[in-house]
């Protein structure tokens, strides 16, 4: 009888631990990708219209890039504009996405020649909560025709 109780306890503890480790709280409040033309022209802007955020924060923002081995450089430079903190004011910044390391291997995750890399943009975004916000993303590479980029995405986390 004592062994039966012990086995039941072990099974229950195992069950509870399994349930606790399988639960995952995802703090993403916005995540979306847009496909870009190949080649991606320098004047083409990808626009993300985000829902109204609750006032406060801070929120963190990441830029996701999907790319192929045909991308001719190690790094991708992006120009990112947003009006999250004040809908009438646009903030502009550049972000460096290191797609390949010095040995030529992809820095992102992926299979079959398509990779994805997430690069932090900011960790201290505090929206005013009054209107929807926008992000605008375009490449600022010296080549006006950029090959090998398939998608660009924005992820906002609380």
Give residue ranges: language-model regions:
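Short acidic/polar inter-strand loop motif in beta-rich domains
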Residues: 67-70, 115-125, 139-149
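Bacterial N-terminal signal peptides that target proteins for export
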Residues: 1-12
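An anionic, turn-rich surface loop/hairpin at beta-sheet edges
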Residues: 95-126
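Noncatalytic modules at the cell exterior or secretory-pathway interfaces
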Residues: 55-63, 123-141
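Post-signal-peptide N-terminal segment of Sec-exported extracytoplasmic proteins
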Residues: 45-73
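C-terminal motif of bacterial Sec signal peptides marking the signal peptidase cleavage site
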Residues: 19-22
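Exposed low-complexity, polar/acidic, P/S/T/G-rich flexible segments that act as propeptides
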Residues: 78-83, 142-158
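Bacterial signal peptide processing site
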Residues: 24-27
């Amino acid at each position: 009888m004592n062994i039966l109780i012990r086995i039941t306890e072990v099974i229950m503890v195992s069950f509870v631990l399994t349930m606790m480790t399988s639960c995952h709280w995802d703090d993403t409040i916005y995540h979306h990708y847009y496909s870009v033309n190949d080649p991606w022209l320098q004047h083409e802007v990808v626009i993300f219209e985000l829902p109204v955020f609750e006032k406060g924060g801070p929120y963190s923002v990441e830029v996701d890039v999907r790319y192929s081995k045909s991308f001719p450089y190690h790094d991708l430079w992006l120009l990112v504009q947003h009006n999250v903190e004040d809908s009438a004011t646009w903030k502009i910044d550049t972000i460096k996405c290191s797609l390949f390391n010095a040995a030529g291997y992809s820095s992102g995750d992926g299979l079959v020649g398509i990779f994805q890399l997430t690069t932090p943009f900011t960790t201290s975004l505090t929206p005013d909560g009054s209107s929807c916000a926008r992000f605008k993303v375009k490449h600022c590479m010296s080549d006006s025709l950029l090959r090998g980029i398939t998608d660009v995405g924005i992820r906002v986390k609380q």
